[in-house]
């Protein structure tokens, strides 16, 4: 079998090296890197051989190729759960450099001789007391981090450190005074948290007050133990200047309070219970917050050092918190936690996740210049601001720039309120956020809208973070940079207990920087005035006058109860019902819309503080995508003969009030010119209110610049009349009024004609009890589509425009022509199914086109495919009617709950012929049937008479709409390939192009000649199996040979062809030699030897040469004179005869006489070697 060397890709004959599943020549098995011979040891990398030196070298991309650095000793952090149960092993912090105490801005001037002015209380843990009267800046406070400094290198001298630590903090096991000699220096701002009971555990935590002002309290007598009380009580009436001090809060586990623990509920004016007998330092405050039923979190026994003296982290912040706490606070957001206890300088540590999450609060501490002129020095500690303390409310106004939330009586101290981190660089320096602001409040279902969801504000004037963001007043509860719009950073504010004040929800909508706010009535309702939306979702067939509940409410209406609201609602319903009946008798039609869902409100406020300043509005646009679904709305379409000159002025000044809408549809606002625009569908409510105030719709001037168009139907002989001269039909004259309004645009006066908005609501959703509604989408310029009207035959109806501006009645998503601003509003309409069918078959192959002449552009609407019902109806009415010239419109309304409305689309193109519409609409007979009952439908059927057909035939070809240019046809070039005239051996198909011929002269497609094992196309040399004629690629051949190796070893190989024997082969075995039957041949004539007629010449122990007897006796081969065997290899010629090299021997000693060795021929004519001759001659001489 053939083997291929992996390295040189040549055939391996003889000895091979088989490694990694590949064969190698002995000289080809070398190192891949250095090409050295691998005779003894080799190493494998990715099935490639390497020598030992190259194997140990680092290689690119090797994951083990990592530079080994010298390990340095370091302190390994220890988990808090592994800390000692008691303080036998206290932390020995490392010393820090000099800590400057120049931040102490206020000092206490004590006039007593016994006062000890310790401006720099740099106490050392190794000293029991520190009564220093000078500035000892070199003996600096150690810089230690309780979260990372626990290590084996720091746990030394545990007993002495424990004693020194307790004595320096004024904690003694057997009682006594706190800090020694009344100095009260101790370790400032070092806090211990202990579990009261048998298993005590204390964790030292450092409270940071970096770069803040501290009080230098000078204790002058033993009465100082009772003077350092917590200023969270009502005992402190000092009006103090707020100073920024940081404190930290970590979540704590649930621990029940033990007996004897010192408790300060943060509400009662509890005096410090620590005196000279309690072992608590006299300048510290003790806290243990009461558990809350909601959060069930209890503060453990806490000893908090006052802010007196040096802070261990004043000079430099520890590594776990970064370089500076100010940088951390400015980049962090407070995450509200319901189970976090609030108190003054309290750490709550959660045992299951130690040190997982730290909340840093910036407290406003108070610092005073206290002039103590008596022996009893009243040291006023920093007033640690308590957010939940109701009794400290008088100081809250002066101690905080932002008014903190009042959660009611201080009953639940463990409930956390969403409090933002406010940073003030100076005292009483209120933060001024940037101007741009956007507020978006959700009103899905009946959830209360909360200002914490999304609130950006301007010009922070309010001190209450619980107040909502009011765009008009520029109030905000959190600082924001200019033009910042990150809606994901804010989370909903959780409800804080029963005593939490109800959140005032405000939704604002602005178009010209003018806003109105609508407060929320209670938690059960959405925005006030939207109580009817739930009724709309449940009863879609309620009376259309229910939508009048969307009237505008100011902030005073939030206090109305439900009965008042229902009473007013019924009164409005009766009033609107009377007005509707009156208007219906006058021929005015009220079309009703009903859509429902849940939603959101969008508020956009420009950078313009002055609404009259239009220059800033060009800076950039805003693109918002907000889901909307609108509640029930009534759009009153009315006729207005003349435009009011002040309509545009009122449109620019209109104020839109959005009372909160439900999500369910998409609103996309794009404004390339930079003008902020809000698409407010609720503006239609203002139109309704103004419309009902005017009984006569023809004399009504809508403040939203309503465009009204009159369509009167006149005699069929008259063509489509001029807008200024409508014709009335003598037989049946009917006027159909449509009032079209342009909702919500914020347009600059000089750009008002170019920047116009349009809103298309399609399909109409109405119940059988409602009037059918057509809402019209129009932008400058406008176009009108008659396809919305359904016509019945034998009725004369003509359309006349009263204004040059026309309206396009198209049930499409939104169609703007030549409008720089496009606004697309799509609605998911529930509880309704509205189907529109428009068919416009024409007289010829071209569809009937209805065109309206207008001053700017011409828009034509085309409808296709007449139904069978229309054809039958027309045939029944007039036998001579040509079906191609008829037009059928049908509006089908179905109240199918749970189905979405089916949308129909119309085809619009522009024509240049102004007379086409007049010619097309000549002698058309129309009729309007208005049903004011449960179902209102418009059925318009165009009935054509013979005169109309003649006029239609006289229409010139030039008046037809321009045909679209023919599409360019691209053809693919096909190249014909001549057939080879042969078929593929595999697929039996004719071969075109390249042809592959194998060793048997068989033809294949190149893609059909594949390996029988891996089925890959063979382009390289291949191998065959003779028994089955299968084709194998080189790789598969090697694999198959390796798999068959054990079997080949058992059968052996042929000594002639060196191929392995198989079970199917006929084998000839001679001694140890095996041959194929066809391989056992004569070496002279190369014929297969049959039977035993052969002569053998053995070359080695495993190979021999054979010759048939025919060649042997014919003289074609030499015969040995000694053995009479055939000579096929090397022979020796001596004494005229041929000998095998091994057969020419000495006749005396029988030693082989080699080539070129002297010998002698004796008398018997046999060879004698030289040694035998010499021996015989010596013996003869001795005789």
UniProtKB/Swiss-Prot annotation:
Residues 83-93, 141-166, 279-294, 426-435, 456-465, 478-499, 863-872 have a biased composition (Polar residues). Residues 519-535, 690-702 have a biased composition (Basic and acidic residues). Residues 56-192, 207-242, 255-294, 364-412, 426-445, 450-622, 632-651, 690-807, 829-848, 857-957 are annotated as: Disordered. Residues 567-591, 703-739, 769-779, 829-841, 925-945 have a biased composition (Basic residues). One of its GO terms (molecular function) is metal ion binding. Residues 172-185 have a biased composition (Gly residues). Keywords: LIM domain, Metal-binding, Repeat, Zinc. Residues 3-61, 982-1043, 1052-1117, 1118-1179 form the LIM zinc-binding domain. PROSITE patterns: LIM_DOMAIN_1, LIM_DOMAIN_2. Pfam families: LIM (PF00412). InterPro entries: Znf_LIM. This is LIM domain-containing protein A. The gene is limA.
